[in-house]
Amino acid sequence: MKILAGDIGGTHTRLALASAEGSRVGIDKSERVLNAGRDGIEQVLADFLAGAGRVDAACLAVAGPTDGLSARFTNLPWQVESAALSARFGLPFHLVNDFAAVGWGLNTLTDADIAVLQTGQEQANASRVALGAGTGLGVSLCVAQADGPHRPLDSEGGHIGFAPTDAEQDRLLVWLRAAYGRVSVERLLSGPGLIGLYRFCLAEAGRSATMDLAAPAAARAISEAGKAEIGRAHV
């Protein structure tokens, strides 16, 4: 069975063709493309599937809420309809929330796939949570089931309100509110959020930016700058 798998984020789309035999899955082809400058996902899929031969089914993980049939992206001006994609490409399409997909993926990890940051006592049947900062903040809460693997609950948890816990965070909230109005945790824990945090730290220190904060790679440059002494002083 050949499967088209996709992860459509706010900035990039990642696609793969996989061959599945029983519980074994092998990746035949993969690609990552920028979403900027594109009107939607259909042409991206058409380019990727050119010459692929027969594909039996497709599943796309989307960065936004979905009922499995349609999705509107949180940080991307696209809308996707599974019926329209099925009609265009002649195969069944299913849509899932991107962090629901991450949650299901947690069930397949082995010890070799995991880097332990803090040791702790594992609790049988405890819930799990997956967090991922990208263009936005993805959150997946996974609950144990009596008769199967942990089940992820679709969540837009990155949009919960930011709750300061000290005076510096109070100032950060006021600073961000002036720019955005309501301040969610995604305004801090994301690529764009990192740029906002950097601007705040510069303002607190009375300094000016030494890089182009409007550049596409600004968040990466800020991460590198954070390794320097001035960056660590504000972490």
PLM regions: where:
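Short coil/turn connectors at secondary-structure junctions
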Residues: 1, 90-91, 124-128
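Residue-level signal for inorganic ion chemistry
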Residues: 15, 85, 194
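Short beta-strand-loop/turn "lid" adjacent to the catalytic site in phosphate-handling enzymes
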Residues: 51-96, 100, 104-113, 130
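ATP-dependent carbohydrate kinase catalytic cores
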Residues: 67, 94-123, 216-231
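Glycine-rich phosphate-binding loop of actin/hexokinase-like ATP-binding domains
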Residues: 113, 117, 124-185
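A mobile "lid/hinge" subdomain adjacent to the ATP/sugar-phosphate binding pocket shared
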Residues: 179-232
